[in-house]
Amino acid sequence: MSENALRLIASYVEEAAAARARFFTDHAELVDAAARTMAVALARGGKILFCGNGGSAADAQHLAAEFVNRFELERPPLPALALTTDSSALTAIGNDYGFDRVFAKQVQALAGPSDVVVGISTSGNSPNVLAALRAARDKGCVTVGLAGRNGAIVPLCDYALLVPSDRTAHIQEVHATIGHLLCKLVDHYLFEAVMELGPYLEDH
């Protein structure tokens, strides 16, 4: 391996680790609060809906699968779906109303006030994700956003999980870790530490 290749690897890994460390140093409590709210929603019979574009669409499908199947804990399936998978709905809505509405109309059709809608956008400005979160708010859903440093997504979210990086790849990598921790913490609250969730069920 060349010295240049080694330097590229070392630099990339160092930057990625720094972005991850900065995020979790500053936002661990916010991740926990979002996960706890998701657990409350599921305990009350709600579901989790995910949306995003490109790599974030893959994240949406990945996380929905972790809830429906399982993450690490052997437990019952949890209701979750990615709004990125129904090609007929996506193309019908896109054709008739435009790409900006492909998630929002699904939220209007499928979401209820006991649900949580998670929008994933590395820029924080994806129009169709923003529209989905607006629709979710109109339906009375809790909204969670995964994004980069900022963006129009922030005021639309009850929980805005913002990664302090300008590199899309590093933002996506931290989003994957956040997603796994949301799964792990939801499992913890629903199946390992049920008593910890009790007061929040009473408060909501």
UniProtKB/Swiss-Prot annotation:
Database matches in SUPFAM superfamilies: SIS domain
Ligand binding (Zn(2+)): H62, E66, Q172, H180
Binding residue positions for substrate: N53, G54, G55, E66, N95, D96, S121, T122, S123, S126, Q172
Pathway linked to the protein: Carbohydrate biosynthesis; D-glycero-D-manno-heptose 7-phosphate biosynthesis; D-glycero-alpha-D-manno-heptose 7-phosphate and D-glycero-beta-D-manno-heptose 7-phosphate from sedoheptulose 7-phosphate: step 1/1
GO biological process, one term: carbohydrate metabolic process
Domain (SIS) ranges: 38-199
One cellular component (GO) term of this entry: cytoplasm
Keywords assigned: Carbohydrate metabolism, Cytoplasm, Isomerase, Metal-binding, Zinc
Cofactor: how and how many bound: Binds 1 zinc ion per subunit.
Compartment list: Cytoplasm
GO terms of molecular function: carbohydrate derivative binding; D-sedoheptulose 7-phosphate isomerase activity; zinc ion binding
Catalysed reaction, written as an equation: 2 D-sedoheptulose 7-phosphate = D-glycero-alpha-D-manno-heptose 7-phosphate + D-glycero-beta-D-manno-heptose 7-phosphate
Entry cofactors: Zn(2+)
EC number(s) recorded for this UniProt protein: 5.3.1.28
Membership in a protein family: Belongs to the SIS family. GmhA subfamily.
Role played: Catalyzes the isomerization of sedoheptulose 7-phosphate in D-glycero-D-manno-heptose 7-phosphate.
Additional observations: The reaction produces a racemic mixture of D-glycero-alpha-D-manno-heptose 7-phosphate and D-glycero-beta-D-manno-heptose 7-phosphate.
Identification of the protein by name: Phosphoheptose isomerase
